[in-house]
Amino acid sequence: MCKLEKFNYALFGNPIDHSQSPKIHNFFATQTGILHIYKAINIPLDQFSSVVSDFFKKNIKGANVTAPFKKEAYFFSDKLTERAKIAQSVNTLKKISDKCILGDNTDGIGLLSDLVRLNFIKKNFSILILGAGGAVKGVLLPLLSLGCSVYILNRTILNAKILVKQFNKYGKIFVFDRQNFKQQNFDLVINAMSRNTEKKNFLPLSLITSKTFFYDMNYSTRNTPFINWCSKAGGSFISNGIGMLVFQAAYSFLEWHNVLPEINYIINILNIK
């Protein structure tokens, strides 16, 4: 584990070896000239609260949180932004005072910003989301606020129903039952399952058209199974989630420093399409 005195911002997760966040935040620091020294820390699964508490007792100002600790970060926070309250998930922590840690969630605005950049979304789109885990909670509100109809396809239907019940007051959200569905076409398909999920058929081909957009919230130096499936299925508009990562990182940076980095510059540096 890195010594806490060596940096003032961090990413907490398990595992974090694959993370691009330190590279992105180093770009932000160089671009803005702000003292922003950012490290990734792998936390044992049963030590989140103790490690993070120790972190904030030092002269430390903020942290990002990734899987599997976003729910724990939600309960760890002394104060929450409205979007974090709704998501019941936190990916950004900010030290307000010695007695107050603010929890925020920038995943939703990060996803929406990247979808807009790619021209993958419009008002009232019909969207199918694959998965009903914690990653989905953080991104639903911006999609629903845009007037989109969101359908949740999950292996365990009960989990999808719980998610729909939590968010149906914010917009049009439904459970998609793969075994019993009415024929329809989706404008956008978002994969929110694990990047290592291997499937021969992520969804029925009858649900997509040549104009359907495909977005994988995961990112990797290699194509994920979902990206490969989309290509084989004939998808023409496909993107992984590294753009979302850059945007959510930028909005975390904004939370900490009141400065929004020039995001397209970072995207170009990372050669993101």
Curated annotation (Swiss-Prot):
S-S bonds: none
Alphabetized SUPFAM superfamilies for the sequence: Aminoacid dehydrogenase-like, N-terminal domain, NAD(P)-binding Rossmann-fold domains
The organism's place on the tree of life at top rank: Bacteria
Protein's UniProt keywords contain Oxidoreductase: yes
GO cellular component, as recorded: cytosol
Active site residues according to the UniProt entry: 70 (proton acceptor)
Its EC number(s): 1.1.1.25
Known role: Involved in the biosynthesis of the chorismate, which leads to the biosynthesis of aromatic amino acids. Catalyzes the reversible NADPH linked reduction of 3-dehydroshikimate (DHSA) to yield shikimate (SA).
Annotated protein name in UniProt: Shikimate dehydrogenase (NADP(+))
Name of the gene this protein is made from: aroE
